[in-house]
């Protein structure tokens, strides 16, 4: 049975300049926002206004979204997919050249059959 994830936190990383240093343009040439997803599982797919993804470590994936994006859907390997609507966490829409941290956690620890 697949376990569910929940958002531990989602916020702007004011001192993190990654989105301005590693700028990714959207289809109109405008700079994207960067959402750093923290999760103790691999992520199979991310849906939304995603322009680029980058696996930084086994527990961190960078996702570049078009400025103004309000949500993202994440499909991890061992958990049910989760949709995150940013306005529920005080962010009306992500802004270009800004970095956000999305920290996800499970209700229960992941137990794999051996």
Where are the regions that the model predicts?
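Short loop/turn and low-complexity linker motifs enriched in small/turn-promoting residues
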Residues: 3-114
């Amino acid at each position: 049975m697949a376990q569910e994830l929940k958002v531990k936190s989602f916020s702007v990383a004011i001192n993190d300049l990654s989105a301005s240093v590693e700028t990714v343009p959207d289809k109109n040439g405008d700079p994207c926002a960067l959402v750093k997803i923290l999760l103790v599982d691999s992520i199979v797919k991310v849906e939304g206004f995603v322009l680029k993804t980058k696996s930084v470590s086994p527990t961190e994936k960078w996702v570049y979204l078009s400025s103004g994006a309000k949500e993202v859907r994440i499909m991890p390997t061992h958990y049910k997919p989760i949709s995150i609507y940013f306005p529920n966490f005080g962010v009306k829409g992500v802004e270009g050249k800004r970095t956000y941290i999305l920290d996800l956690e499970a209700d229960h620890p992941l137990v794999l059959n051996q």
